[in-house]
A protein has these predicted regions:
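An N-terminal, well-structured beta->alpha segment
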Residues: 1-45
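Glycine-rich phosphate-binding loops that contact phosphosugars or nucleotide phosphates
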Residues: 45-52, 56-164
Length: 164
């Protein structure tokens, strides 16, 4: 067991690492960011948001935020998309894809299907050299140096970066 002081210090360290991840995103804001926001603000259809694993959970949160602020949005799980759910996408929709690696098998199968539809694709990705980043119209860089978890395993800072 840890002492209360040790627990407090761990908490401060975790929050500091999360803060560093957000600062890195601030440094990464570029023209793609501005163009992606402009595209979202001018969409006449839905904003379709998708991801795999923890990125899918963040995608659902983003959809909830869009809907609560008046932007029509729907969640489409990337695994379900390649098994028939692509039917929810209309020609006037835009698609936001979230992925830490940008290299998951589901994303690699999904991207050609989405590109063939002609919708604008926004990647929120932690690897700007990834397959996803190279296929998207706009790339929002959510690269983080380390996760805030002690073993650098749980997607803590990377999911915070995606949500911001």
């Amino acid at each position: 067991l840890k002492t209360l002081e040790e627990i407090r210090e761990i908490g401060k360290r975790v929050i500091s690492q999360e803060n560093q991840a957000i600062a890195q995103i601030l440094a990464n804001i570029n023209t793609d960011f501005a163009e992606a926001v402009s595209t979202i603000l001018s969409v006449t259809g839905n904003v379709v948001v998708t991801g795999i694993g923890k990125s899918a959970i963040i995608a659902q949160k983003i959809v909830a935020t869009f809907n609560s602020t008046g932007t029509n949005a729907v969640f489409m799980h990337a695994a379900d998309a390649i098994h028939g759910d692509l039917g929810i996408i209309r020609e006037d929709d835009i698609i936001i894809l979230l992925s830490k690696s940008g290299e998951t098998p589901e994303i690699k199968v999904l991207m050609p299907l989405l590109k063939a539809r002609g919708n604008k694709l926004i990647a929120i990705v932690g690897n700007t050299e990834s397959y996803l980043a190279k296929q998207a119209n706009f790339v929002l860089d959510t690269t983080v140096e380390t996760e805030a978890c002690p073993n650098n395993l749980a997607p803590t800072s990377s999911t915070t970066a995606q949500m911001v």
